[in-house]
Regions:
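Helical "substrate-binding/catalytic lid" subdomain
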Residues: 1-87
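Short, basic/aromatic-enriched C-terminal tail that caps enzymatic domains
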Residues: 85-106
Length: 106
C-alpha cells in the first residue's frame, strides 16, 4: 500500500485488491495499524526465519528484505509508539500516509 501511494496508484490498488482478494484486503487494513509499534519484534522474527531457510539450503533473501522493511517502520514515528498509548497510525490509511512521507524523506 505504501508503494502504491508513492507511485500514485493507491486508490486503484485498493480497489483491485478489495475486488480480487477481499479477505486479504480486510486483513491488511486491520493488521497494518497493529503491526507498527511491534515492528522491532518482527525484525528478529524475519531474521530467524531467514536463518532457518539458509540452514536448510533455501534462499533467505526474501526474509532479509522483509526484515529491512520492518526496520524502516521501526525507525518511523509509528515504530516508536507504545501500543497502549498510540496517537498516530490507527488506520491503514494513516499508516500508509505516515510511512510514505517517512520513506520519501529518507
Amino acid at each position: 500500500m505504501i508503494i502504491a501511494k508513492l507511485e500514485g496508484v493507491e486508490d486503484a490498488f485498493a480497489q483491485e485488491l478489495n475486488s480480487s482478494q477481499p479477505n486479504l484486503f480486510n486483513h491488511m487494513k486491520r493488521w497494518l495499524p497493529d503491526m507498527c509499534p511491534k515492528a522491532y519484534r518482527w525484525v528478529g522474527e524475519m531474521e530467524e526465519i531467514a536463518k532457518t531457510f539458509d540452514d536448510n539450503n533455501l534462499s533467505e533473501k526474501l526474509f532479509h528484505c522483509v526484515a529491512e522493511t520492518y526496520m524502516v517502520v521501526e525507525k518511523s514515528i509509528l515504530g516508536k509508539e507504545i501500543v497502549e498509548k498510540r496517537k498516530k497510525g490507527k488506520t491503514a490509511e494513516d499508516v500508509t500516509d505516515i510511512l510514505a512521507r517517512f520513506v520519501s524523506k529518507n
